[in-house]
Amino acid sequence: MKTTHLWSQEDEEQLIRKLVNNFCDLINRSEEEGLYWTGLKCDLIELAHIVWETGQLTDQQGRLMDFQSIVWHICRVLHVRVPCNPSSVVSSVRARKNVRVGPLRERYLQLIVDAKIQDPMRLEIRRRRR
């Protein structure tokens, strides 16, 4: 049985804005701040791809950041080993069939709409205890 989507275009746009803002904030941080990604690495790479698709992240010279750079920066800050080929990770995630876990975008939208969690990505980031 197929699930019904209970979110609007506005909900999707809100999610994308939140993700872009999170990435802008995070890639400018230092790994010494002790932030750690606790979710799946493939989810983080998929998030990076969603953000890259918006074309809204720029480097210090004002040029659009490429996908590899976004992945490198976010993995550095969140203490995740950078995959050799991030694009293949995205391809693998999108090619999955018959999995119990739905697409990341849908999971995050469900958290926003049903659980009233405004920033689902932040649930998967923890700070190292000092």
Regions found by a protein language model. Give the residues of each.
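Acidic, serine/proline-rich, intrinsically disordered low-complexity segments
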Residues: 1-62, 83, 113-130
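Generic serine detector
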Residues: 8, 30, 69, 87-92
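Short runs of predominantly hydrophobic/aromatic residues within well-ordered alpha helices
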Residues: 41-48, 67, 101, 105
